[in-house]
Structure formats: structure tokens, C-alpha cells
Regions:
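N-terminal secretory signal peptides that target proteins for export/translocation
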Residues: 1-8
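Outer-membrane pore/translocation modules
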Residues: 86-245
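Short regulatory "switch" loops immediately downstream of catalytic or recognition motifs
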Residues: 1, 68-73, 200-202, 238
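Bacterial N-terminal signal peptides
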Residues: 11-23
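Outer-membrane beta-barrel biogenesis signature
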Residues: 27-37, 74-97
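Short glycine/proline- and aromatic-enriched beta-strand/turn motifs that initiate or cap beta-hairpins
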Residues: 29-73, 101-116
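Transmembrane beta-strand segments that form the barrel wall of outer-membrane beta-barrel proteins
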Residues: 40-49, 75, 210-222
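Short acidic, Gly/Pro-enriched loop/turn segments at secondary-structure junctions
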Residues: 72-76, 144-146
Length: 245
């Protein structure tokens, strides 16, 4: 068993390395934006431990690198030259005069049924599943609007290594490991196309002072991992609110 886990670990590292190679890396200062314009790194972590449950969408981790504001996607230095004409043909994100950003990401999402103590197949509940992916997103924005198109590619199934991730987290926290991962979805390559529009419908931000704004969002995703439409609304308040979304 120890040897099997070791081989799995090596495969996971190989897959992660392949995803990193597949997604263009942020360019150096000489190839992309002017010096002083750095890429921004973000780490997202979602887990239902905060609500005391362990079911359905139970864990999500995402690492993202976002370029500085650009006048064109080519300026990022992270796109191969052959890809630039294709990006220019994408809808919604090529409106003249708007700022651009390129975002690169690596992530993993994990799903389990409500009853995680059973080691037999549960036919009337969400199956065990993991989705590990790399993504590239293109943003087009001004002060009041943000359009995003994202492409994600990865794998669902045992080689997503969601089981190993959950086992590690549960062992570190000294809690029971879900028993039914032997019945997770089989390996299948995944591809997702995601679009989202955000609009700032209220803007009472004050530089150096207390402000408030309100943002609506509307989006959809199409792919063999999930297909959905979404809509939402958020209100932000705080000191010196940034001009982001």
C-alpha cells in the first residue's frame, strides 16, 4: 500500500507539472508589461468545515496569477504569438478602449455524498468526484463593467487526486476519512468554457474615506464537467474601496 501511494504521489506531481507547462507562465519584465507592473498572486480556499458539514461541494483550492492592467492581451507577454489572433476573435472581451488582464490558474474541486461513512455505492446521492484543472482567463473592464471569458482543462476521476487531498487534510485534522472513494467517478478529461459579466450599479466609493458600492453578476458555463447559469448581487462597504470587482 505504501508503494502504491508513492506512485500516486509521483503521478500527481507529474500531472501538476504538465498543467503548469500547458498554461503560459507570466513573462519577465523584458517580455511583457513595463517594469513596476507586477502580476498579482491569489490563493482561494473553500471548505465546508466552516459550516460543520462534509458533503456535496466540500472543498475547493485555487491558485491564480493575474496580470497588471494592459492595453492589449499581447502586452501580457504570457500568450504565444499564434494564440493572439484567436483571443481577438472571442466575444465580449475585445471592446476597444477598455483595460485588459490575463489570469492563469491551477485548481482542484472536491465533491462527496451526504453519507461519507458508507463504503458501499450510494445510488441516490451525489457521487464522490474530484476535478483538477488548469485555466486561463481574459478580462476586459472599465470602472463600471467587467467581462470575463475563462477556459479550463483538466481531469475528473482518480487522477484528479481529490481522494488523496481529502485524506491528507482529514488526517492532519485527526478526523475520520470518508469511506466511499472507491466508488468515485471514473477518469475523464474535462473542458469548460465560462463567461461572466459584472456591472457596478452603485458607486459611492470615496478615496481615503468610507464608501459603498453594489455589483451585479450574470454568467454561464458550458462543458462536460458542469453546465450552469448563475446570477447574483453583492454590496461592499469599507474604507478606501478599490476600483476592482
Amino acid at each position: 500500500m505504501a508503494g502504491l501511494r508513492y506512485r500516486h504521489g509521483m503521478s500527481a506531481a507529474a500531472i501538476l507539472f504538465a498543467l503548469l507547462l500547458a498554461v503560459p507562465a507570466p513573462a519577465g519584465a523584458g517580455d511583457g508589461p513595463a517594469p513596476g507592473k507586477a502580476w498579482t498572486f491569489s490563493f482561494y480556499f473553500e471548505n465546508d468545515l466552516f459550516s460543520g458539514t462534509d458533503r456535496n461541494y466540500t472543498n475547493g483550492v485555487k491558485l491564480s496569477w493575474v496580470s497588471p492592467d494592459l492595453s492589449s492581451y499581447r502586452e501580457s507577454g504570457g500568450l504565444p504569438e499564434w494564440a493572439v489572433p484567436w483571443v481577438r476573435k472571442l466575444p465580449f472581451i475585445n471592446t476597444p478602449g477598455l483595460q485588459r488582464n490575463v489570469a492563469l490558474s491551477l485548481g482542484q474541486s472536491m465533491y462527496t455524498p451526504e453519507d461519507t461513512d458508507r463504503d458501499t455505492l450510494i445510488r441516490n446521492d451525489r457521487p464522490y468526484a474530484g476535478w483538477t484543472y488548469g485555466g486561463i482567463a481574459f478580462h476586459s473592464k472599465n470602472e463600471s463593467r467587467l467581462d470575463t471569458i475563462e477556459i479550463q482543462a483538466g481531469i475528473v476521476g482518480p487522477h484528479s487526486y481529490a481522494e488523496e487531498t481529502q485524506r491528507l487534510v482529514h488526517e492532519l485534522r485527526d478526523i475520520d476519512v470518508p469511506a466511499g472513494w472507491d466508488h468515485q467517478l471514473e477518469d475523464e478529461p474535462g473542458l469548460m468554457l465560462i463567461y461572466e459579466r459584472k456591472n457596478r450599479v452603485l458607486d459611492k466609493r470615496r478615496p481615503g474615506g468610507l464608501g459603498v458600492d453594489a455589483i451585479t453578476h450574470l454568467g454561464a458555463a458550458l462543458g462536460n464537467v458542469s453546465t450552469y447559469a448563475n446570477a447574483g448581487f453583492e454590496v461592499r462597504t469599507g474604507w478606501n474601496l478599490p476600483a476592482d470587482f
